[in-house]
From Swiss-Prot:
Ranges for region Necessary and sufficient for the association with mRNA decay enzymes and mRNA decay activation: 1-93
SMART domains named in the record: ZnF_C3H1 (SM00356)
Entry-linked InterPro entries: ZFP36-like, Znf_CCCH, Znf_CCCH_sf
Residue spans of biased composition, Low complexity class: 86-95, 197-209, 280-290
Region (Necessary for mRNA decay activation): 167-320
Residue span of region Necessary for RNA-binding: 90-166
Comment block on domains: The C3H1-type zinc finger domains are necessary for ARE-binding activity.
Stored PANTHER family: CCCH ZINC FINGER/TIS11-RELATED, MRNA DECAY ACTIVATOR PROTEIN ZFP36
Post-translational modification: Phosphorylated. Phosphorylation at serine and/or threonine residues occurs in a p38 MAPK- and MAPKAPK2-dependent manner. Phosphorylated by MAPKAPK2 at Ser-53 and Ser-179; phosphorylation increases its stability and cytoplasmic localization, promotes binding to 14-3-3 adapter proteins and inhibits the recruitment of cytoplasmic CCR4-NOT and PAN2-PAN3 deadenylase complexes to the mRNA decay machinery, thereby inhibiting ZFP36-induced ARE-containing mRNA deadenylation and decay processes. Phosphorylation by MAPKAPK2 does not impair ARE-containing RNA-binding.
Transmembrane spans: none
Biased segments, Pro residues type: 66-85, 300-309
Name of the featured protein: mRNA decay activator protein ZFP36
Positions carrying Phosphoserine: 53, 59, 81, 83, 86, 179, 190, 211, 221, 270, 290, 317
């Protein structure tokens, strides 16, 4: 068969099918136009080969329901729906709100925070704070020993007599006391500062390890601590004394200085030459902290006494 005849037959067949094919294209184009109006633009913008899920439908305003189901009601977006889990934040008021004066307002008469300031603008806005029951009832240790306090007006202890809120008759106590003897002592009543009426100093504190003298037989009077160094201060003789060595130490009638070199005697010096003296002073050797004062401590300086020996050593040296 000739190729030209085959070509002509194919061309004739194509001309016969062209009107039907054109009608199909026109009808298809009309269907596409009508269907594009009924489908939302958000759905048409997706790829044709991708399935649409209900989760992705939240981003658009309308989602086509699956076959056999009624259309769903439109749901508001996440930016329009109020979140029930996040309650509205309410400003919390501090317990110290308006309990102190505003420093900026007190100095310049104005404050940039205005009504939102946490401090009081004048005595009219000042509130009473809830304080501890012991607030301003004890003396400030740092203020009376160092002359200043890092907390200033916010300190909970007393700085001035006008701040005293303690009950009348209640002694003022320092949190940290220092013993006059230089030894650590417990909590005790301190001498009141100027402007306070408190109990006067009546005794000197001793270390718990040392044996204190009997009541009323303290060899030092309270005035000895307030006297200037080098000024002779009178002293009453204690009776009775605890041992003969202490009795000999109380013979001078004056002391030189408030704390004129309290020295502890060696064990060899505290022993006497007679048996009675040896027996009486033996009790003082039981503890190393018993206060035994020398005869020249409270009086004028005296030449050192020659070292004494026990009677048994004297007899040994004589026999040799």
């Amino acid at each position: 068969m000739d190729l030209s005849a085959i070509y002509e037959s194919l061309m004739s067949m194509s001309h016969d099918l062209s009107p039907d094919h054109g009608g199909t294209e026109s009808s298809g184009g009309l269907w596409n136009i009508n269907s594009s109006d009924s489908i939302p633009s958000g759905v048409t913008s997706r790829l044709t080969g991708r399935s649409t899920s209900l989760v992705e439908g939240r981003s658009c305003s309308w989602v086509p329901p699956p076959p056999g189901f009624a259309p769903l009601a439109p749901r508001p977006g996440p930016e329009l729906s109020p979140s029930p889990t996040s309650p509205t934040a309410t400003p919390t008021t501090s317990s110290r709100y308006k309990t102190e004066l505003c420093r900026t307002y007190s100095e310049s008469g104005r404050c940039r925070y205005g009504a939102k300031c946490q401090f009081a603008h004048g005595p009219g806005e000042l509130r009473q704070a809830n304080r501890h029951p012991k607030y301003k009832t004890e003396l400030c240790h740092k203020f009376y020993l160092q002359g200043r306090c890092p907390y200033g007006s916010r300190c909970h202890f007393i700085h001035n007599p006008t701040e005293d809120l303690a009950l009348p008759g209640q002694p003022h106590v320092l949190r940290q006391s220092i013993s006059f003897s230089g030894l650590p002592s417990g909590r005790r009543t301190s001498p009141p500062p100027p402007g306070f009426s408190g109990p006067s100093l009546s005794s000197c504190s001793f270390s718990p390890s040392s044996s204190p003298p009997p009541p009323g037989d303290l060899p030092l009077s309270p005035s000895a601590f307030s006297a200037a160094p080098g000024t002779p201060v009178s002293r009453r003789d204690p009776t009775p004394a605890c041992c003969p060595s202490c009795r000999r130490s109380t013979t001078p009638s004056t002391i030189w200085g408030p704390l004129g070199g309290l020295a502890r005697s060696p064990s060899a010096h505290s022993l006497g030459s007679d048996p009675d003296d040896y027996a009486s002073s033996g009790s003082s050797l039981g503890g190393s902290d018993s206060p035994v004062f020398e005869a020249g401590v409270f009086g004028p300086p005296q030449p050192p006494a020659p070292p004494r020996r026990l009677p048994i050593f004297n007899r040994i040296s004589v026999s040799e």
